[in-house]
Amino acid sequence: MSDNAPVTPPIFDGHNDILSLLYDAGLSMDAPVDIDRFITGMPGHLDADKMRKGGFAGGFFAIWVPSPIDMDVKTTQMNLPVYDLPLPSEIAPDQAVPVALAQAAILHRMEQAGYLKICTSTAMLQSCLDNGKIAAIMHIEGAEPIDRDFYHLDMFRRAGLRSIGPVWSRPNRFGHGV
């Protein structure tokens, strides 16, 4: 590489959905992560190969609990000349926690396989950036998995959670909005 070649800054992603995509692909806490799918098989999104080629240094890996929806009804409504879709209903923690735990487990399996490091401090993040290791900040998008007494928050924090977006496109006990 010549001294005049442009230096590409490391890419740090403010949000990615790889955990929910892997979860939706049928992965769970009881099933092993399909490492081959993560290495090269995530069309249109991140995978290990795309991360490496694109200079991906790390990012916020979102844990997200989807709303149950009837896509046929939604598609019909959205094809009308004018439509108004209400926000999805609140999801109770007992429904959200298993999905969130499964996605957190996927992130931990990715770390155990050596593809990234879950960062829980700025020192860990800086070390990853300095050493070329993908830095993962565990993020919850919508605080549905967090109970009123914050027991689940403590559990997720111990698992590596360092960022929460309190609401997504539905209300929960902490707020409402998009």
Task: Place the predicted regions along the sequence by residue.
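N-terminal hydrophobic targeting/anchoring segments and the immediately downstream early-domain regions
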Residues: 1-178
